């Protein structure tokens, strides 16, 4: 009788173990949510590169082997992988170091708005107009300009009392210019830990200053970019306002959520990832829209992807 009970008990245990393994196997097969859907990457036009004649050969591993109408296409699978990697790096770093400082940089027209918006919501510094040479390498010069701005602010508060109308207008014009260039960095007393840049080519001086001072640089890499120019790059279209907005917002989400805030785009449903319309956005140009439709149709049939990626790059220890 005891033997029979033992056999029953063993059989029950074995059955339970098998059930547990089945549950574990089922759980392991569940698809993890992606940081952003591929559909949104396509909607934002992140895959558009430049003409083949303008490419940087160092970007080869981030591009589809095929080109469309003489233009390189950026591998959206690599974009997704490296975007999520950058998100995790920033999120974990800020979680461990809450006082980490950032500077968002994007002086081209397509980047200005999202650079400023995401910097403000994360309490970061930003430059969305002109990068003043020496911003990171010659702080004393910047401090002097900030002091001049503060003096003019004091005079403006008194409506430039003691000055003629013409002199007052000249001073107000100077003050407006200083605000435009310095508002995003006026409180920066020390070097930021990270620079997040929309276009390393356009803002090459900023990137060079950052790397010379040990500031880690994360940037968008278009097909004409040099991946060696930054510490970590995310291959994507840097000429589309939608593409820049999508990438910058997700990177800002990494900072915001690490500090207890809410994400706007990262790991959100497509219905919440609402990309603004830009009249200057090339993805709205009919010529590019035809290329986009063609690409979407072909990608569904299995466009070859680039498997070789560099995910072991360390941005920060």
Curated annotation (Swiss-Prot):
Q: Where is the composition biased (Basic and acidic residues)?
A: 18-30
The protein's name: Small ribosomal subunit protein uS2
- What does the similarity note say? Belongs to the universal ribosomal protein uS2 family.
Q: Which UniProt keywords apply?
A: Ribonucleoprotein, Ribosomal protein
Q: Write down the Gene3D superfamilies for this protein, in alphabetical order.
A: Glucose-6-phosphate isomerase like protein, domain 1 (3.40.50.10490), Helix hairpin bin (1.10.287.610)
The protein's matches in InterPro entries, at most eight in alphabetical order, are given as:
Ribosomal_uS2, Ribosomal_uS2_bac/mit/plastid, Ribosomal_uS2_flav_dom_sf
Instruction: State the Gene Ontology terms under molecular function.
Output: structural constituent of ribosome
Residue ranges of region Disordered? 1-30, 293-317
Q: At the top level of its lineage, which domain of life is listed?
A: Bacteria
GO BP, one example?
Answer: translation
Compositionally biased spans, kind Low complexity: 308-317
* Native organism: Mycoplasmopsis agalactiae (strain NCTC 10123 / CIP 59.7 / PG2)
A single Gene Ontology CC term:
cytosolic small ribosomal subunit
């Amino acid at each position: 009788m005891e033997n029979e009970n033992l056999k029953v008990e063993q059989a029950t245990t074995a059955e339970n173990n098998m059930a547990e393994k089945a549950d574990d196997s089922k759980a392991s097969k569940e698809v993890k949510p992606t940081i952003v859907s591929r559909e949104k990457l396509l909607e934002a036009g992140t895959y558009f590169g430049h003409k083949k004649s303008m490419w940087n050969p160092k970007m080869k591993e981030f591009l589809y082997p095929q080109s469309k109408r003489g233009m390189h296409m950026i591998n959206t699978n690599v974009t997704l992988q490296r975007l999520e990697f950058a998100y995790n790096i920033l999120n974990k770093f800020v979680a461990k170091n809450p006082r980490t400082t950032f500077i968002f940089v994007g002086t081209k027209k397509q980047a200005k708005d999202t650079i400023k918006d995401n910097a403000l919501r994360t309490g970061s510094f930003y430059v969305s107009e002109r990068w003043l040479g020496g911003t990171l390498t010659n702080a004393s010069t910047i401090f002097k300009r900030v002091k001049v701005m503060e003096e003019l602010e004091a005079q403006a508060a008194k409506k430039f009392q003691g000055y003629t109308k013409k002199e007052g207008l000249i001073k107000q014009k100077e003050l407006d210019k200083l605000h435009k260039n310095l508002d995003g960095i006026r409180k920066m007393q020390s070097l930021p830990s990270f620079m997040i840049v929309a276009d390393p080519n356009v803002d090459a001086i900023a990137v060079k200053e950052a790397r010379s001072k040990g500031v880690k640089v994360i940037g968008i890499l278009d097909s004409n970019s040099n991946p060696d120019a930054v510490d970590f790059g995310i291959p994507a279209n840097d000429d589309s306002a939608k593409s820049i907005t999508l990438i910058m917002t997700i990177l800002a989400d990494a900072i915001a959520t690490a500090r207890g805030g809410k994400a706007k785009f990262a790991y959100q449903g497509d219905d919440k990832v609402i990309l603004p319309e830009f009249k200057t956005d090339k993805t709205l140009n009919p010529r590019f829209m035809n290329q986009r439709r063609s690409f979407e149709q072909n990608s569904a049939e299995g466009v070859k992807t680039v498997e070789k990626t560099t995910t072991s790059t360390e941005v920060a220890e």
